């Protein structure tokens, strides 16, 4: 009888509540063995794997479990400690490692954790490799186990943070500094809590830190990129030039201008795309945006001669489209920005540095840079759900969607989808008037909640 192969990977690796299926120590050991097995299938000889993590308390046990699985198969592991996800991608390349693993649940609460796997080139692994790993885990067939003298060694990389700090600074023009800029920085008590302040301070900015005291259980807790109100207030209070909010693993960024207004990923994409186009550095004068990208932002990009190619939501999908269409800039409203000229995955620190560079070079405030971008009124409501039942099988939900689309006509749109990483249904409505989109979004959200939900979430 053929054993069922259980799907472990979601849209961004394996993720779930720590110590519950699928995020258990036992599974992590098996995942370590499976990664080793895949590497040994691809080429013979010794292999090295980089392992990083964010600041969640459960990261310690998952780190040990993964290392145990990897080294039991003869893999040498290089443990980095707390470091942003883009730091793992960078160091995997810098050390010529065969793979990189990041232990993080990104923007999720502390009780969740996850495992993301990178190739030797620093890209997230393909669907094909994910399926092979799942197959090995299901069958518990990982290849040949080494004898006692051929198991792998585990080494701690003591200068991992320093290496990533220098890498991030190198994306800022040599000879320029951030002198004179006052920055409010929120690191979400996450993986960037040490490296991000160092990057901006070493470039001579005045940095006021929030969310830089991790306890293991306060990551993303009313702070960071999901809660920009923290830096909105702080920017005004400290009369700062700009606010920067990162998420728990440092791969996304939301900014705030000197007036306290939020500058999301859509606007960061627009600012950076226009700058690169002016310098003839935007490949094909195209960017990758997503189905969530604000219509007003798309109109702005078109007005400055930039074509936006639309991708499904998720930095993985954005990257796939960037590679397919040979585009060097892509991003999401949520703050995942990929600058392929610098890194192979979303990088919050590097993204913020590019915006700061543009501010300095153009002698502009952040509000100046966004002044020509007029966003369409948009409402986004997140509904926590018990399970992800296919939305097209829910008659009341489909009826509500038809009614809302009829109300909007050609002047707006509605998007209803499940999160790829959480039990959340996202309701997005866009139109001409703010009060209308708010009301229509709430109508749909209430019906989704009555059918599937456990309540609204922020």
UniProtKB/Swiss-Prot annotation:
<dbReference type="InterPro" id="IPR005846">
    <property type="entry name" value="A-D-PHexomutase_a/b/a-III"/>
</dbReference>
<dbReference type="InterPro" id="IPR006352">
    <property type="entry name" value="GlmM_bact"/>
</dbReference>
<dbReference type="InterPro" id="IPR036900">
    <property type="entry name" value="A-D-PHexomutase_C_sf"/>
</dbReference>
<keyword id="KW-0460">Magnesium</keyword>
<dbReference type="InterPro" id="IPR016066">
    <property type="entry name" value="A-D-PHexomutase_CS"/>
</dbReference>
<feature type="binding site">
    <location>
        <position position="249"/>
    </location>
    <ligand>
        <name>Mg(2+)</name>
    </ligand>
</feature>
<protein>
    <recommendedName>
        <fullName>Phosphoglucosamine mutase</fullName>
        <ecNumber>5.4.2.10</ecNumber>
    </recommendedName>
</protein>
<keyword id="KW-0413">Isomerase</keyword>
<feature type="binding site">
    <location>
        <position position="251"/>
    </location>
    <ligand>
        <name>Mg(2+)</name>
    </ligand>
</feature>
<keyword id="KW-0479">Metal-binding</keyword>
<dbReference type="Pfam" id="PF00408">
    <property type="entry name" value="PGM_PMM_IV"/>
</dbReference>
<dbReference type="InterPro" id="IPR005845">
    <property type="entry name" value="A-D-PHexomutase_a/b/a-II"/>
</dbReference>
<dbReference type="GO" id="GO:0006048">
    <property type="term" value="P:UDP-N-acetylglucosamine biosynthetic process"/>
</dbReference>
<dbReference type="InterPro" id="IPR005841">
    <property type="entry name" value="Alpha-D-phosphohexomutase_SF"/>
</dbReference>
<keyword id="KW-0597">Phosphoprotein</keyword>
<feature type="binding site">
    <location>
        <position position="247"/>
    </location>
    <ligand>
        <name>Mg(2+)</name>
    </ligand>
</feature>
<dbReference type="GO" id="GO:0008966">
    <property type="term" value="F:phosphoglucosamine mutase activity"/>
</dbReference>
<comment type="similarity">
    <text>Belongs to the phosphohexose mutase family.</text>
</comment>
<dbReference type="GO" id="GO:0009252">
    <property type="term" value="P:peptidoglycan biosynthetic process"/>
</dbReference>
<dbReference type="InterPro" id="IPR016055">
    <property type="entry name" value="A-D-PHexomutase_a/b/a-I/II/III"/>
</dbReference>
<feature type="binding site" description="via phosphate group">
    <location>
        <position position="106"/>
    </location>
    <ligand>
        <name>Mg(2+)</name>
    </ligand>
</feature>
<dbReference type="GO" id="GO:0000287">
    <property type="term" value="F:magnesium ion binding"/>
</dbReference>
<dbReference type="InterPro" id="IPR005844">
    <property type="entry name" value="A-D-PHexomutase_a/b/a-I"/>
</dbReference>
<dbReference type="InterPro" id="IPR050060">
    <property type="entry name" value="Phosphoglucosamine_mutase"/>
</dbReference>
<dbReference type="GO" id="GO:0005975">
    <property type="term" value="P:carbohydrate metabolic process"/>
</dbReference>
<dbReference type="Pfam" id="PF02880">
    <property type="entry name" value="PGM_PMM_III"/>
</dbReference>
<dbReference type="GO" id="GO:0004615">
    <property type="term" value="F:phosphomannomutase activity"/>
</dbReference>
<comment type="function">
    <text>Catalyzes the conversion of glucosamine-6-phosphate to glucosamine-1-phosphate.</text>
</comment>
<dbReference type="Pfam" id="PF02878">
    <property type="entry name" value="PGM_PMM_I"/>
</dbReference>
<feature type="active site" description="Phosphoserine intermediate">
    <location>
        <position position="106"/>
    </location>
</feature>
<dbReference type="GO" id="GO:0005829">
    <property type="term" value="C:cytosol"/>
</dbReference>
<dbReference type="Pfam" id="PF02879">
    <property type="entry name" value="PGM_PMM_II"/>
</dbReference>
<feature type="modified residue" description="Phosphoserine">
    <location>
        <position position="106"/>
    </location>
</feature>
<dbReference type="InterPro" id="IPR005843">
    <property type="entry name" value="A-D-PHexomutase_C"/>
</dbReference>
